[in-house]
């Protein structure tokens, strides 16, 4: 099986280790991974800021970048969710709208792909310690991907999982929200950090780099000894 990797801007520019872990996990499962170099930003920052024309341009670029893919896999629920906006954005053009629907249908978040398409629940990972999991808004509310991450994490050897109190509360990142509504965002991430501390976890795990950067930044400022890990990194741990 061959997939095209949608690496996302945050991973490409700030957390390339997550992209590397994603590739290594997939290859270990027998998947051939290709990286289309023509891929660009999915357009979510422009979309959230109301720049429709710029978003449409980004959407068309992404549709062309992945038009030959059978499967597109991304280690980001947020960016996959953006692909679901493309058909509506391009509804005035039947040709582009149809292509947008095709892209949305063949794109999978990493854990969703592993569990639902590869039918794998144990990737052979091992990580000693206690962890809790942050369920990002896009993963739970828009994509309805709730079970796959927990299924995979439950099979990581030597890893103990503790439920996160108020788990579905937003961390306060929200893309441009954290820039436009900084005081509110700060209060939200403080509440998230408090919830994480209540678990006594050594690791906070998530599937969206935006959330993890926000939470990790706050933990660092507060000098909290809790390690932030993307789920791809956990699944790649040995």
UniProtKB/Swiss-Prot annotation:
Pfam family, any one: CCG
InterPro entries per the UniProt record, alphabetical: Cys_rich_dom (IPR004017), LutA (IPR022822)
GO MF term set: oxidoreductase activity
Any one GO biological process: lactate metabolic process
One GO CC term on file: cytosol
Signal peptide: none
Physiological role: Is involved in L-lactate degradation and allows cells to grow with lactate as the sole carbon source.
Protein family: Belongs to the LutA/YkgE family.
Full protein name: Lactate utilization protein A
Species name: Bacillus pumilus (strain SAFR-032)
Taxonomic lineage from the root: Bacteria, Bacillati, Bacillota, Bacilli, Bacillales
């Amino acid at each position: 099986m061959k997939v095209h990797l949608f690496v996302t801007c945050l991973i490409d520019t700030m957390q390339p280790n997550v992209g590397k872990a994603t590739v290594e996990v997939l290859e270990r499962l027998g998947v051939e991974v290709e990286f289309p170099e023509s891929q660009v930003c999915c357009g979510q920052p422009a979309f959230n800021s109301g720049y429709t024309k710029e978003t449409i341009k980004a959407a068309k670029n992404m549709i062309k970048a992945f038009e030959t893919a059978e499967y597109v896999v991304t280690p980001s629920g947020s960016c996959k969710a953006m692909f679901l906006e493309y058909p509506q954005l391009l509804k005035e053009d039947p040709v582009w709208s149809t292509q947008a629907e095709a892209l949305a249908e063949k794109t999978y978040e990493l854990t969703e792909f592993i569990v639902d398409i590869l039918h794998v629940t144990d990737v052979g990972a091992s990580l000693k310690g206690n962890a809790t999991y942050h369920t990002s808004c896009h993963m739970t509310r828009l994509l309805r991907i709730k079970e796959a991450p927990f299924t995979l994490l439950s099979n990581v050897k030597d890893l103990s999982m503790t439920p996160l109190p108020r788990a579905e509360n937003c961390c306060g990142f929200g893309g441009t929200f954290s820039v436009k509504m900084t005081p509110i965002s700060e209060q939200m991430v403080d509440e998230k950090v408090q919830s994480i501390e209540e678990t006594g976890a050594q690791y906070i795990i998530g599937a969206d780099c935006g959330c993890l950067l926000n939470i990790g930044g706050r933990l660092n400022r507060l000098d909290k000894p809790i390690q932030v890990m993307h789920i791809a990194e956990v699944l790649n741990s040995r």
